[in-house]
Amino acid sequence: MKRKLYAGINILGLTVAIVSFLAIALYVHHEATYDKIYSDSDRVVRFAQKFVRSGEEQVVAMTPSALVPALMEEIEEVEVATLIFDYSIFSSVLIDAGEGNREETKFAFVDENFFEIFDLELLAGAEGKLLAAPNQIVLTFSAAQRYFQKPLLAVGNTIKVDSKDYQVTGIVSDFPSNSHIDFDFLASFISTRHGKEPQWSPANYYSYAKLIPNSDREAFTSKLDQLVEKYLGEQLRSYGFEVSILYQPLTSIYLGDSQLKEMKPVSDIKNLYIFGSVAFLLIIIGIINYVNLATAESTERNKEVGLRKVLGADRPQLFGQFISESMILSLSGVIFSLLILYLLKGVFEEFSGVSMNLELLLSPLGILLVLSLMLSIGLFSGFYPALILSGMEPLRALGKKITGFASGAWLRRSLVVFQFFVSISLLLSTFIVKKQLDFMQTINLGYEREEVVALNFHYNMGEKYSALKSELERTAAVQSTSLTNSLPIFIQAGYSISPGGDNDKDLMLTGFAVDHEIVKTLNLHLLAGVEFSDQDINQTAAYEENAEMNIILNQAAIRELGWTVEESVGRKVNFNGLISNVKGVVQDFYFNSLHNQVGPLVIFIQPSEANWILAKLPKGNPKENLSKMEDVWKGVYPERPFAFRFLDEEYAQMYQREQNVSRIFQLFSGIAIFIASMGLFGLVSYVAMRRTREISIRKVLGAKATDVLKILSSDFFLLLGLSAMFSIGFGLWFSQEWLSGFAYKTDISPWIYVLAIAFVGLIALLTIGYRTTKVFLQNPAKTLKDE
């Protein structure tokens, strides 16, 4: 019965460890192979613009539309180039395939060379240039399924995009989940104004090139610099800018340095190193768990070893037998792991936020990984117990005089220390990541994000906005509304101002285009001056006449300009080519990720640049207010569906990557503690069995269960204390590494360390207490008789 129990615990421990290892391996593979799914991905680069002004620099992932044709015509190292105009940045689109409008967000314009670089599988359509003519569109298979009963027969059909007809020329496979590009609809770029007439301004396009094989990168860089100088250098220097075009390998975008206006949030390669380490640590503590349980079980197998040696078995035969047993357990663990991995695929995908491709485990490399894992676990876990058991002397084994174990006490204690260390360290990591996440979710951003609704604002809706605004406010469903070019959680548009006078320092800063009620809608804290008024709206029409306009600056901008808050109001600056008056100063608010410092910001009136309507709802009854808003919306914009986002939910979504990391840490720290507890159970079992006679005598002499618990647990808690010291060192290092990626970070209290150590200690105490109680309840008379 005991053999079955130990075998069950061994298989369970190894299975959990192997499942964890394989799940993490698939996650790491998914992240590490971002954008490597495309042919010749090692030859593909993406371009970015680097602006330098007054010693300040910005790197923006977007470039002008004229860059791609210039690359194709003037740089021989370029085999083919393409560009993407991500329309979802500015607005959603309405798609109608004959059964009514549906709003879609994953829409982009691309040129005819797109599929020569991003070679998705063509499921339907003619090979060649799919998007060479105006008003052509390619759908992914998922998008085609939404609009056509027979998606592969959609080619040749016409669909309406914002009431304009587009002909479907192809159906392609969906973009892989590990691609930084992800659209459902790809329309021909030549359908747009800049597609017909490429321009060197504005820079609203993502540009890529496939270089010729074995291209000279130094020569390519030199020619790129010459091209930039030819078309942009003189013009931008006249504005005080130095500009250069950088290029970045396609395969390093996701795990590389983040740039402004990234198409998709990037990740951090440090996370992959961390999770890879966690995977190996879980396997190691799974092996330790097996060793400890095998050691405990060996006290039950000494007679078997002695008898077999008396009957002629030699040490190699016994060694082979015990290794074979560990290999069988390892094989069982792998088989159960693959089954569990298949069954829990969806759970892990929800935890990690990535899709798991189990087919990778059936590839030659995947099969090699699984076999190597099985053999490694079998050999490493079985070697030490096999060495000890096969080395027993027959007479001492039969007489229960086990001499080999005492000499290995240091190893077993070291293994326990390591298990405690891993468990506490993972728990500490979980607490640290979670505390930073909580800090980010509860920090005062400097503006209202609760009860603020964002509505996507389409470019052709402007003429009806006044009607929408007045109707909404008449219903009391909203307190105020404001048009903006960005959500306040993520503002990226770049501008510059020149203060003039004695201060000749030009300042690069971020621009927030709004209407006059932005301060009221977001409840911004005005430190000096006054907020915008409806009279400021009239300035928009006068911009071309170089009329004076009003702007509001934040504290960071004021500091950079060397002004005080009070003296800033009324100052004149040159902003965007216009003489502008500083009308007010607002307290700094977080308009970007907390990974970055709050930078200089200018707020200015320009509703024509708006992409969003922000609506501040009254407190309480959000469903009722949204219902009223929808009724008003349908009355003003019946052709567009009512779609809304809560600002606080969008803010939380910004940190989805960190939330995924936190959930993964929670999951695997729990698994580590579970496996370590089973290993501890095995070692306590071993100690309790060795001291059964002593415990029985103490019980006869009147000892209580708590007395026995103190005796058996004292050594383990000394080991826990030693582990805690190592874990504290790890925790200090991890907190510094993890938090270094945030400009604004939480304070890590010493109580976090105490809590992690105490939690693991409690689990250990419960494990030891359970086993001790079981031994204590045995009949001492029977135990002493057996002895």
Feature map (PLM): residue ranges:
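Small-residue-rich transmembrane alpha-helices
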Residues: 23, 327-394, 435, 714-776
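Intracellular coupling helices
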Residues: 1-9, 13, 286-329, 391-402, ...
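Hydrophobic alpha-helical transmembrane segments of multi-pass inner-membrane transport and secretion
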Residues: 2-29, 267-303, 330-331, 411-436, ...
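Membrane-helix entry/capping segments
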Residues: 1-5, 38, 228-279, 299-300, ...
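Membrane-proximal extracellular/periplasmic loop immediately following the first transmembrane helix
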Residues: 24-91, 101, 202-209, 221-223, ...
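Mid-to-C-terminal secondary-structure elements
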Residues: 111-124, 137-267, 467-657
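Generic structural signal for small/hydrophobic residues in well-ordered secondary structure
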Residues: 10, 31, 47, 71, ...
